Amino acid sequence: LETHGTWQKLGLSEPSWNIPASEPEWLPACLDRANNMFQRDKNHASVIIWSCGNESYAGKDIADMADYFRSVDNTRPVHYEGVTWCREFDYITDIESRMYAKPADIEEYLTNNPQKPYISCEYMHTMGNSGGGLKLYTDLEKYPEYQGGFIWDFIDQAIYKPLPNGSEFLSYGGDWHDRPSDYEFCGNGIVFADRTLTPKLQTVKHLYSNIKIAVDEKSVTIKNDNVFEDLSAYTFLARVYEDGRKVSESEYHFDVKPGEEATFPVEFAVGASNAERIYEVACVQNEATEWAPKGHEIVRGQYVAEKISTETPVKAPLNVVEGDFNIGIHGQNFSILLSRAQNTLVSAKYNGVEFIEKGPKLNFTRAYTDNDRGAGYPFEMAGWKVAGNYSKVTDTQIQIEDDSVKVTYVHELPGFSDVEVKVTYQVDYKGRIFVTANYDGKAGLPNFPEFGLEFAIGSQFTNLSYYGYGAEESYLDKLPGAYLGRYETSVEKTFAPYLMPQESGNHYGTREFTVSDDNHNGLKFTALNKAFEFSALRNSTEQIENARHQYELQQSDATWIKVLAAQMGVGGDDSWGAPVHDEFLVSSADSYQLSFMIEPLN
């Protein structure tokens, strides 16, 4: 039973012609549905709650349905969310249940003498690149009355539609000339319509695990949230990584009874290097089950003793040519051009191979997500798109010495007075390019989605490896389940095929990444002083944002790279107005510095 459209108009409750309400002519149909469901499911052990319906407001007819369930079965509770809108019928439900309630609102209920257990019958609208902030909900498990919720929903709903060339694409509302339409609004699954897995499952898998792991340098704390099972079916693997490379692994077996938590000492075997060190404990299955093979990883915990590169340019003689339009830096097997006219890096040749297709430009915005559009961010943050696309260089500062070349471009941003961004390129005798972009915060401006540089290299550079948080895309509010490590993938694979193309493929906390061709020619990007975020995709931000379907993204003649100081989270409380939580925003009032080094692989 659902009659949403009869009592809610444009998102507002207006029940003047609510159905079924307390109308006697609807009561037989309501009771018939209740009886049919009861007779069908009464002997299924997996059915533990009777629900009177979904989004149908409240009234005597639904109250009579609840009375019917209780009269025929006194062993199962009755659920109905609609009383949220109509509290005089609160007695219908045994469970406090709300649609898309914010974590703070749920916590307020749980901390104010709750009379009923709480379940979010729908929450975390995972439309497109979504699922950010899920941990804010699962953290509520500390309250005994909180019984979790149901992510909306499991799978994208889309239909294959033929194209004139004989291929097919996953279509959504409006693609069949249907009007009115909610367009891609049914693309809200944690599984794609073709039953392949979305990157959103990375976060869900980790946070929904009944085994929680916290690690430090000498111990592991394990919480067993299972109701009946101990941990005898699992092995725990204690590993140490140095700069992302595994140096040791040992096996442990821990006895933690259901519902209990315990801390155990762990002998992590470390190396002698002065590298960044990752202490990790992973929980894996001892034997195969019907749903997973032997050795399947359930969850893992990490502790990182952080150490980011502080590399600086090496002083040695350079061959520099300063012309009217370019500054050329030449050395053994490399030549680099910094342009006075284009106001950026325009050429980087190593071993005769040109890498730069389009030089770095300022970037403040992303290809907006479904949640971004629902929250009104494209309007709120539109000025930053203009600022990135049309910034003007008002000053070029050139420092040329025998052993050093440094060029700084000072950008003025249209629409934002007294806001400057400085981008500096420094080249050393090895041909390494040290890049720094500085934004000095200013109060009173709208926030921006991200800050960094976007540029293009040759399309042949498609092999991607990185040392950062993976294996799927990771964002500030989607870090649970993303583990720091070294990953091998490709430019094609790192882009997630959401129903409507949007921001995708970001990797948070990256220390370094390489992009190469099949002959091992390529570039390495290393974070300096602080980890960055990056993506390497087949299309630019603008191309992705302008496409409505995946097939509209034509094969690009370049590999597009973004290196970012910061990017805001993707949100997920809902897709029709909920903003990204404050702690996951990028504030324009704060200062940001992006610093990294570019060098050839060979």
Where do the model's predicted regions map?
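Extended substrate-binding grooves/exosites of carbohydrate-active enzymes
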Residues: 1-217, 226-232, 237-245
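Flexible loop/turn segments at secondary-structure boundaries
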Residues: 7, 56-60, 86-89, 104-105, ...
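Short beta-strand elements of extracellular/lumenal beta-sandwich folds
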Residues: 217-226, 434-441
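Beta-strand-rich binding/interaction modules
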Residues: 219-252, 263-267, 274-285
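Short proline/glycine- and polar residue-rich coil/turn motifs
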Residues: 254-262, 585-588
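Beta-strand/loop-rich accessory regions of lumenal/periplasmic or secreted enzymes
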Residues: 269-275, 289, 303-602
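Polar, glycine-rich mid-to-C-terminal structural blocks
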Residues: 281-309
